[in-house]
Swiss-Prot record:
It comes from Actinobacillus pleuropneumoniae serotype 3 (strain JL03). It catalyses: L-lysyl-[protein] + 3 S-adenosyl-L-methionine = N(6),N(6),N(6)-trimethyl-L-lysyl-[protein] + 3 S-adenosyl-L-homocysteine + 3 H(+). Belongs to the methyltransferase superfamily. PrmA family. One of its GO terms (molecular function) is protein-lysine N-methyltransferase activity. This is Ribosomal protein L11 methyltransferase.
Amino acid sequence: MAWVQIRLNSTDKQAEQISDFLEEIGAVSVTFMDSQDTPIFEPLPGETRLWGNTDVVGLFDAETDMKAIVEALIASRLVEADFAHKIEQIEDKDWEREWMDNFHPMQFGKRLWICPSWREVPDSNAVNVMLDPGLAFGTGTHPTTALCLQWLDSLDLTGKTVIDFGCGSGILAIAALKLGAKQAIGIDIDPQAILASGNNAEANGVADRLQLFLAKDQPQDLQADVVVANILAGPLKELAPNIITLVKPQGDLGLSGILATQAESVCEAYAPDFNLDSVVEKEEWCRITGVKK
């Protein structure tokens, strides 16, 4: 049986309302997808957690009049009259197998691979991090994640301490440990991030070298040789005084989660304390790195 789907972008606050409405007008299923590869974690009891930038995907029978669906969405006032959307025909498939087949081991830099658990590692002599894409893991396909992983791979982390500020699923901290760091420290505002990072570290055999702190419990005198923060430009600027103090003198700093158009303002917040490298861009995103003065 064939299907037709509509995909539209929404905020986390409106996604559920749009989902309910699509089901009311005939959708056989509605799913939420992250549009920016941002980690999201298991909800607390009674809570639904969504990405701040969420794609809503409604699946309909192939005979459905999708023009009428679009008109109904506009009439509902849940979307703007000129809302961006994509409609496409979908063949009937083994969706679980299709989903698994879409995730392949990915290489970042010269040494580092991120591999889903159901795949054989391409190079047993490489640095392999085993992480499954899902609710608690950004897949690594987003440019900001890739930029940070490539940067970590380029460093000599042997014997060093690394802080992953805004650790999410712990992918950067775990990668740093696998790349030779002596110790890693993950910091996040979300308790679910701390739990996810711990579980992923356990699965990769590095939990004994990873310390995890909620931001409010971060030790006052905490410092590291390397600090990486893949969050957003706003928090990177607002939290610059805190992030700067985390880096030891002559230590390395890597920042991402930044649109290329935001790079200049983020650089201004860190330039007084760091000798900054040239900004590296990937698609519309960028990475800022430097060494503390």
